[in-house]
Amino acid sequence: MTIQVLFATEYDSANIVISLLCGVEVDHDLYPILYKRINYNNGASNNDGSRSGAINFDDRVNDEDSRLNAPVDDTIEFCLQTQSCEDSIRIRPVFYCHAHALNFETRYRTHEVLGSATLLQCLDESRTLTMYRRILSEIITEPSSASEKRNPAPTNLRHLVYFHRDVLVKYLTENFIMPTSPAWFISVFGSYEASLVLTMHYYLLERQYSTVQTTQHYAKCFTGDMGKPLVSCYSMKDFMIMIQSSAFLGKTAKFTHYCKLKNDRDLQELMAIDASINAFRQNVCLTEAEHVHFMYLAFGTALAKTKFLDYTLKTSLLSNNDDQTNNCNDYIVDNCAVDNHCQNDIDEIIIPRSSTNRTFAISEVSYDRSNSTSSSGVYSMDSCDESRGSEDSAMCSLYESRYLSHNLKKELLNIMELYFTPTSYLNIYVKVHKHESKSPLFEGYSIDTCSEKGTVFSGTSTSMADRLRKGNKMFEGLFEETDSEGVSSVLNIIASNRHAILPRCEDDDSCGKSTSGMPNRICKREIVFPGLTRPAPMYRTDGFNNMQICRYFSVVSKENWFSNSNLTDVLNMVPDEYVSDERLTESVWVPDVKVSSPRLSEQLYRSRHEMFNDRLPVYNFVGDVDLKVTGPVSKDWMFSFCRTLRRIILETFEHLFEKIDHGEHPVYFFKSGCEPENGSFCACSEKIGLRVITPFPRNTCILGGKTMKHLCEIINHILFLDKEMFSLVNVTVVDKNCFDYGIYSHGKSVRLPMMSKVDENLGFLQNRLLPLFIVPDSYRHGGRHKVFVRDQLNISNWLHHNASGTAYDPCKTISYVLSIDDVGRAQDVSFIDHKLNKLLKKEYVHIDTIIELFKSKYDISETRYFIEKIVWPQFLRTIKTNYHSAAGNQFNNVCFDDTSWPCVQLFKIHQGTRRNFSCIQHDHRDGRENVQFFLDFRPESATTIWTTLWSRCFSRKCKSNAKNVHVSHKLTIQQ
């Protein structure tokens, strides 16, 4: 039998121990704090060693503490706390004494301090000498001097310690914690008697993985009586007597058993929480940001304060502690001999007898919903005997139900499952607001794509502004003056249906004509663009002149599309028989053009972008898809992705709008061209660009770009929730938000199919959007696939605001979709962030609300003026301080375009015109002014906003149009 004794001194323990080992009596005493009996040869010394809360040390003969070959007679190990915790050993011996000579337990009960003379009489020099020889052999590897090599190692303990005193003092100081005041013990282990005694005993004398904080928590769960406070305990002797006389020493064996069971219970809960969270994560595709936020949300919900306190009470012994105090009132220090009566009491409280021997596998914690019959979280289990007492049944259900993980599923994961399941998401969270009308209330484009004579109005942004100014002067007084700056004003005029009535001249005999020959009713659109009686698309064309990109804007109402775009021969080469989508795509060969044309009439059919008009109804869904992939994809993968995407879009439209014939409804796909090598299908290794276009169901159109953005966000959310799509893209696609909803802002443009990008350096055409045919079932027979190919190559089917000939059924009412809302979101906050804000009790404040507070504080009415006077000066100072003068000077005279608020674009004013900037990060070879700068506004709280300055440079050195963030500033309203 061995007794481990934790002692302390009021002086430097290292020097006291070394002096004792040298045989020198010192004036300082040793204060035994705690002790424990250990039988190194008993293989059943730790009956609970197999539990995860403790370490299984059944074979202590092979343990490091038994390195001196378990003694024949009883031995006392005088130990100190180690600096490091290796293999969960927190105390190690510094010397040994003979137990029969010291009679330690009698001295402990009488609160006797141990003087140096007493210890010298009982010192076990043999075992102590063996221990320090081993220590010195590890510290001193080889003899350094010739004299050390000649002289043999001392065989006497006193000689050994004397000749290596400095080395051993340093060793003890570096490897052991040697407090000299009770204040250290009180600050670390607790300021109350129960916390200190129970925590010290379990943490220092039991080999387990729990930290001090965890053990203190267990002590609070173990007893409600924390004993007396220790603030008046100053001397080490008083501290020793307090511990030795504490009634809580009689509960250490019971507390040890409770801690191991509680530790195992906590571990099972955490494993169940992990399994539930991982099971959910493996079945949904989240972005990186959503993954991080979901982890915070899940663990914050599972371990919320109220739930954790409730769980703590359910697994504590507070209600049973007082009844069982007298059962274990003897101080039992041998953990191997825990009284069976005490152990059974704890088993009945923490784990019922019927559950004690059960093995709980992780597979029990799956993501299947648990049927709860109680709102408290303790729900019945079939394995519990109904005839058992209410307390036993509750504890049985508590242990088997995994209380915390059950509440996690109940309060979050089951709700998340509804939101991340396509059908339930569309049924519960998506609300569509429609207006039904028997007759058309709005009109879209009216274009003719087969006209031999074209109607095209083209020019630069400057010439378009001149048109507006001339129109304002020409009929001043008939219409309100239109802002002549920006292409958005041109779009507003194109969409306007407001007419003015011209006064009739009395001398005019002609019917319906004025003297000027103008009609009596005239629209402002016809003034600016003569002959344009109905809305028409406005395109942006990128040209290349004088080694730089030039942008032109064209309003086209009539053109011969197939002839001018050289697609007539393509249609003639379509095979007569349909074989497969892959074969049809390969057989339709489109002639390639690599160089920009200096003539706008030709360049219009090589580079064309449609500009979104927020004032016109939307008849076609035009999706701009950017697939961020891990590497090149195969042909089979690409076509499988398109077919699955087609099905998901049609199912979504069918649920939101009207019934759709999946075998008839067209969905057009166009993929950005690349140059594959070695016969591969695609060479895109980082990003695949797609254009997905499909008309809305008949008699359905959407009003407003905001509604289109919401629809795009819904499709983004649903897309990767589909099981077939998820298995297809889980490894291949990096980011799930592949649909760009920024193209649905007023004045934003999207590149049309069959069009190319213009290289900014040499003007070459690249990444042309080429057709990829996914033919509906009804078009696959009787040569109808030719009709589908012609429709897919017809520009009239690609435009946002152009209704097809079959868009309306006169026998049915027309549905104008006014809004499509995801009620699971809070304004601009995602579903997960909304839940996280509620968990953190963080109230979301819209940016417009905060801006109004700032404007009222500074007595400013216009947002642009607020940006110019309050926000921008901070950025200007930062730019001038951190960038070279040439870069900073171009920001001296700027203006702001808040059309896409809260993203504000900057322009510099040069000779009365708005222009972009030069790059401030690098000195590019051409140094052109084509860099766009923006200010992003984001709310942090009800009184704070963050503003970020970022830019997009088109050069490769700046990552080709990637977002480059420069600086952020914080603006706060002082309360």
From Swiss-Prot:
Pfam (any one): Herpes_UL52
Q: What class of enzyme is it?
A: transferase
Q: What is its main location?
A: host cell
Positions of disulphide bridges: none
What keywords does the record list, in alphabetical order?
ATP-binding, DNA replication, Helicase, Host nucleus, Hydrolase, Metal-binding, Nucleotide-binding, Transferase, Zinc, Zinc-finger
Q: Name one GO biological process term.
A: bidirectional double-stranded viral DNA replication
Mind telling me which residues the site (Essential for primase activity) is annotated on?
624, 626
| ZnF (CHC2-type) intervals | 919-958
According to the UniProt entry, its GO molecular function terms are: ATP binding; DNA-directed RNA polymerase activity; helicase activity; hydrolase activity; zinc ion binding
Q: Which InterPro entries match?
A: HSV_PRIM
Compartment(s)? Host nucleus
**Record flagged with keyword Lipid metabolism:** no
E.C. numbers = 2.7.7.-
Question: What task does this protein carry out?
Answer: Essential component of the helicase/primase complex. Unwinds the DNA at the replication forks and generates single-stranded DNA for both leading and lagging strand synthesis. The primase initiates primer synthesis and thereby produces large amount of short RNA primers on the lagging strand that the polymerase elongates using dNTPs.
HAMAP family (UniProt xref): HSV_PRIM
Q: How does it assemble?
A: Associates with the helicase and the primase-associated factor to form the helicase-primase factor.
Q: What name appears for this protein in its UniProt entry?
A: DNA primase
Q: Which organism is it from?
A: Elephantid herpesvirus 1 (isolate Asian elephant/Berlin/Kiba/1998) (EIHV-1)
